[in-house]
Amino acid sequence: AKSHGLYDLIIDPGYGFAKTTEQNFKLLKESSLLQSLDLPVLTGLSRKSMIYKTLDSTADKALNGTTALHMQALLSGSHILRVHDVAPAQECVSLFEALRNS
């Protein structure tokens, strides 16, 4: 990509796009493997059906599930979280950083 003038790249595994719930969870479970690409990884799990369907809820009521999976993504090496609910995501990142730096 760099040989074609593309320098600002990130990996977005595309949670929710053309995948079953099971495939999305497997992708998240194995997402640490994306670190081998040596590029920042963006995780977009906010309000995804894999969360609210698993919890038998609705997108707007599944914030705790989103936060739990955000923590998993961070622990697996994600660099960027794409979110709808900024304050709870920032709390998650702050707790992750405290854990990582302890």
List the model feature ranges, each with a label:
Residues 15:
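Active-site metal-binding loops of divalent metal-dependent hydrolases
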Residues 3-7, 18-102:
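Active-site-adjacent loop and "lid" segments of alpha/beta metabolic enzymes
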